[in-house]
A protein has these predicted regions:
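N-terminal secretory signal peptides that target proteins for export/translocation
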Residues: 1-22
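Bacterial N-terminal signal peptides
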Residues: 25-37
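Bacterial Sec-dependent signal peptides at the C-terminal "C-region" and cleavage site
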Residues: 35-45
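A short beta-strand-turn-helix
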Residues: 47-67
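Short active-site neighborhood of thiol/selenol oxidoreductases, capturing the structured segment around
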Residues: 62-77, 184
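Structural microenvironment flanking redox-active thiols in thiol-disulfide oxidoreductases
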Residues: 80-120, 128-137
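Short, internal strand/loop/helix patches
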Residues: 117-158
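Thiol-/selenol-based redox modules, centered on thioredoxin-like
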Residues: 155-156, 160-208
Length: 208
């Protein structure tokens, strides 16, 4: 059967030129959706810092070991009173547990921290947490508070070190419970950790 005139055939053929804007638009939409699906760049994430200013991950070097983060301030009286106990516990468990002091105050410079460690006899490594990356991860609110993570780096306990302080300025003659010590033993043995107990001390600035 004879075909129609060439002009009739051309009238029903899709125009490539008219399809181009739609194709470009769809390509841009797909590209935008793919970008939104990508995880945030690691450089944009909050991070703790070593005292030399380099990014720090206290869990990275502690593969297979529990991690203990103890949050302190250079100018918090209660935090400073706990220094001998913190140092003693870190020395007791240091071979089996990764211990870190964490300074969440933005005002705590590396030199202030080094001086604070000298003044209070600290021998354990320290980190700065001005962006509160570790504060958020550990769910702490005051200094001093501790966070204990098991060997798989799951948070087991966060809160007070012991119950020595009833309130700010009110202390017992001696502590009757020892949450940090109990939590570390739980992390090492696989037993049930103590219940999270709020700390008594100096509020971390952004959480006041």
């Amino acid at each position: 059967m004879p075909s129609g005139p060439p002009g009739d055939t051309l009238m029903h053929r899709p125009s490539l030129t008219s399809q181009q804007p739609l194709s470009i638009f769809l390509s841009l939409v797909v590209a935008a959706l793919l970008l939104l699906a990508l995880p945030s760049s690691p450089t944009a994430q909050k991070t703790a810092l070593h005292l030399d200013g380099t990014p720090a991950d206290p869990f990275l070097a502690a593969s297979g070991k529990p991690v203990v983060l103890v949050f302190v301030r250079t100018d918090c009286p209660i935090s400073n009173r706990y220094a001998p106990l913190i140092q003693r516990i870190s020395s007791q468990y240091g071979a089996r547990v990764a211990f870190w002091l964490v300074y969440p105050s933005r005002m705590a410079s590396a030199e202030k921290i080094r001086q604070h460690e000298r003044d209070y006899g600290y021998k354990l490594p320290a980190l700065r947490d001005p962006q509160h990356a570790l504060v958020t991860q550990a769910q702490v609110r005051v200094t001093p508070e501790a966070a204990v993570f098991d060997a798989n780096h799951r948070l087991l306990y966060h809160g007070r070190i012991d119950d020595l302080y009833v309130d700010f300025g009110r202390a017992r003659p001696a502590a009757t419970t020892h949450e940090l010590d109990d939590a570390i033993q739980a992390a090492l043995s696989g037993k049930t950790p103590p219940r999270n107990m709020p700390g008594v001390g100096c509020f971390i600035a952004d959480l006041e």
